[in-house]
């Protein structure tokens, strides 16, 4: 992660080789990374799409995880992670919960929403000072980590379905490869007066299977969730989110 461009091209190349500099630089970088990853095969090296500007398929051969952006605001991250997921698998996208007010935009979002957005990003984690959090927040983080452990394989290696996106809402669900689990997340950015109820249909489930959702305390058939769908909670608060996990019975 180096937060600057290469501006001073060395004088070591002949004039007719100056245009080869950046290509030669990349070959040298790959040579160094090949040595590091071979020498330390158990270390996960992460590249950076922000300062390093190195989020491409070439670097992924050596660094299979990339920090998607230094912008960690939950609302900003919706578009950042969605755009990144159009090209890269969720297992490669670094997505963390950070402190509020956010260090870049100053926004204050609920810990639950920050967690839900980061979990849907892929490689989930935290970057904040735990000593400054309340006991309630620490308990919530502990629960988030436990939840992510139960859905990590589905998020990182399942199928992602983008369900509903407007200027004010975002919804998506992951389905595990064996269709035994689905993870649904809905985000409402701003509360609106007299807003209509929002209806969302899931995708990718086993239509004949019965799924249990502990968050709702109900069971649903796959075709029911995909054809009838769910009504989103009518909660009047900004930056509201829900996460529903459906496990095949």
Where are these regions (language model features)?
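C-terminal beta-sandwich/jelly-roll accessory domains of carbohydrate-active enzymes
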Residues: 190-249
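Glycan-recognition surfaces
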Residues: 23-131
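Catalytic cores of secreted or luminal carbohydrate-active enzymes
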Residues: 112-162
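Carbohydrate-binding surface patches
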Residues: 165-207
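Active-site-proximal loop/turn and secondary-structure-junction residues that shape catalytic pockets
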Residues: 2-8, 49-53
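A glycine-rich phosphate-binding loop feature that marks nucleotide/adenosyl-phosphate handling sites
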Residues: 47-56, 134-138, 161-168
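Hydrophobic, well-ordered secondary-structure elements that form the walls
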Residues: 1, 45, 118, 184, ...
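Aromatic- and acidic-residue-enriched carbohydrate-binding clefts of CAZyme catalytic domains
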Residues: 4-30
């Amino acid at each position: 992660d180096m937060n600057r461009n290469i501006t001073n091209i060395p004088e070591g190349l002949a004039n007719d080789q100056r245009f080869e500099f950046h290509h030669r630089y990349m070959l040298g970088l790959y040579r160094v990374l090949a040595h590091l990853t071979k020498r330390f095969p158990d270390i996960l090296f992460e590249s950076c799409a922000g300062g390093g500007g190195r989020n491409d398929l070439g670097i992924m051969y050596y660094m299979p995880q990339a920090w998607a952006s230094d912008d960690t605001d939950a609302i900003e991250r919706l578009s950042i992670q969605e755009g990144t997921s159009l090209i890269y698998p969720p297992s490669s996208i670094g997505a963390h919960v950070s402190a509020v007010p956010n260090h870049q935009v100053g926004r204050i979002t609920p810990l639950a929403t920050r967690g839900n957005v980061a979990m849907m990003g892929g490689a989930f984690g935290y970057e904040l000072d735990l000593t400054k959090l309340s006991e309630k927040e620490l308990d919530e983080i502990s629960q988030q980590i436990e939840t992510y452990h139960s859905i990590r394989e589905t998020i990182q290696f399942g199928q992602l379905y983008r369900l509903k996106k407007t200027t004010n809402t975002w919804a998506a669900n992951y389905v595990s490869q064996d269709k035994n689990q689905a993870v649904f997340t809905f985000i409402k950015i701003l509360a609106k007066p007299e807003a209509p109820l929002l209806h969302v249909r899931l995708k990718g489930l086993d239509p004949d299977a019965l799924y249990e959702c502990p968050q709702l305390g109900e069971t649903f058939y796959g075709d029911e969730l995909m054809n009838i769908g769910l009504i989103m909670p009518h909660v009047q608060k900004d930056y509201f989110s829900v996460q529903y996990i459906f496990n095949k019975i």
